[in-house]
Amino acid sequence: MARKLLAFAALAALVLTGAPQPAAAAPALQEVMFVGNNWAGTVDVIRSSGGYARLGGFSVVPDLDTRLLDIYLNPIRLAYFLGIRSGPGEGHDQLVDDMYTTPDGTALVASRPSLADVVSIDLRTGLLRWRFGVSGYRADHMAVSPDGTQVAVSASTSNTVHVLDIATGRQLGSFATGDKPHENVYTDGGRYLWNMSIGEVNTDLDAPAWDWTKGDRRITVVDTTTFRTVRTIDMRARLDAYGRRDLSNAIRPAVFTPDGSRLYFQVSFFNGFVEYDVATDRITRVKTLPENPATSDDRTTFVNDSRHHGLAMSPDGGKLCVAGTMDDYATIVDRATLQEGPLVPASKPYWATVSGDGRDCVISESAADQVSAISFATGRRVATVAVGDHPQRVRIGHVPVGWTAPATR
């Protein structure tokens, strides 16, 4: 009898409290593209392929008033803030540079150059989840690890790369670089992280005779389990050995082949790109692309020393997409022959990335406030979408299916 009463009591408790429920399933995600509007401090979200329809947009500086108060109360920070405005910002504050979504698609992590930080923005509320202030006074390019759990950010003025937990913003490690760390690229499934330092790009000492003033420009390769440097590469000696002493060794956008055997990169002041064999540690080819007759050869007119800034590769490794920034075009290049296709007119294209379906290259046209998609197969423009003020970085990301942008704040 006692056993029956206990069983009845247990059943009654289960009815009253409810049966244990399985954990809620994670929301289904859709792939999108994020476009960072550097001067506006906003992000536009567009479809990652097809017609590239705009899905919405939101601010990545909801805390701007607080940040500006902190800056204006600190004379040193204020001096750097105004220096960024008059230098790389071309008279504007640089409010968003790079961005990636968290693996669950609920937040966007963005670097904010003028505010010298990295923040996580909740994609439902538009509010900050966390903020990490970088060392020094400017945040720049980022990279996300292949598993999506870590994000690396270049701290320009402190010659440091910080590696953060993408969910919490906690620093997992950091390492020293050359002068003005810029591009970051994970390789070997995330085992290594490559950082390219570009040196001083904000002075007018751009003539070859003044190259020595540009500082220490090198690649720093670290092991991501220890963040210790395993290799440094100064392309100066490699370029000289190839017979191109005239080219800068400041590496700008860079992309590896799918098998990691070749690295393609742009350098300061040059209308073209370089091919580097990773295993043999040699420059193997240099491609010079056409100059726009309307573009001045005065190096001081190139934005932050970049004549061309933007490089992507088709998923099969067969084609390269080049953003010819100061020459106002983009073009698809056959990687085997290095023959360029049609020169697609573009207004100061500043970045290139691959569409979600791998068929197109998407460039940001920073002077026209739009992004354009160019077919890898035909080399022709297939779509253009209006975005915000001065688009730069374009990145693939994910949001929940049915996502709508948070209210503007």
Per-region residue spans from a language model:
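Predominantly soluble domains enriched in secretory-pathway, periplasmic, or organellar proteins
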Residues: 22-409
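Bacterial N-terminal signal peptides
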Residues: 7-17
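Short, flexible coil/linker elements and helix-boundary hinge sites characteristic
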Residues: 1, 15-18, 67, 243
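Bacterial N-terminal signal peptides that target proteins for export
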Residues: 1-7
